Amino acid sequence: GEFSTNFTDITPNVEFFDVYSPPITSKYADVYWTMMPEIPLSKEIVSRFNNKVMAITGYEMDQVMVHPDGTEEPIPCFWSYNHHYVSHLQGANSKMIKVENKPKYDMWEFSHGHESYKFITINESDTPNNIATSQLFSSANGGESRGSFHGYPYNKAQLIHSPKSFYIQPMQIDTRNREPEYINDKSQYHPGILPKSNKAPPTASYSG
């Protein structure tokens, strides 16, 4: 049969809410890649789903600047490239902890380097019917997915018991040229200092 591309035909009467990460600040060529502090969900969401199950049928993400008046503005992709992200939705019965990580083989030092620690989620108590106490979101997670809705097929959802907070781990690369004549140009990419190994042509509209 046919698969509708109109999500309201697949899962009608859905609701949504927004979650903002803490602000990210960086300098040109910085790579921001870290687990951010815990982000509590709104009191309304926590209260509504306390001891209940939330069914998540889709999500989307973006990189935005939030102005003092509360309005949003998408960040140009050539200012900050979202290489990838991982988001963890935590329930009241779960806890994320930081543990020491001992590499099992020497090849680690030839890739990302030794990972001295990692974050894991543990269940502090059982939930009715063994409903999940945490969920992870990291599908199609590159910069090209910004503002693109990730919707699940009919009758499919990620379930979580008593959702309470998010943990977000973005990896973003700062490619915004800070020269005075370019710093506020949102219409096109202006390369800054680049290594000799850069493969992009001089007229490229992207960072190489």
Q: What does each model-found stretch correspond to?
A:
Residues 1-208:
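A long-range scaffold signal marking pre-active-site subdomains of enzyme folds
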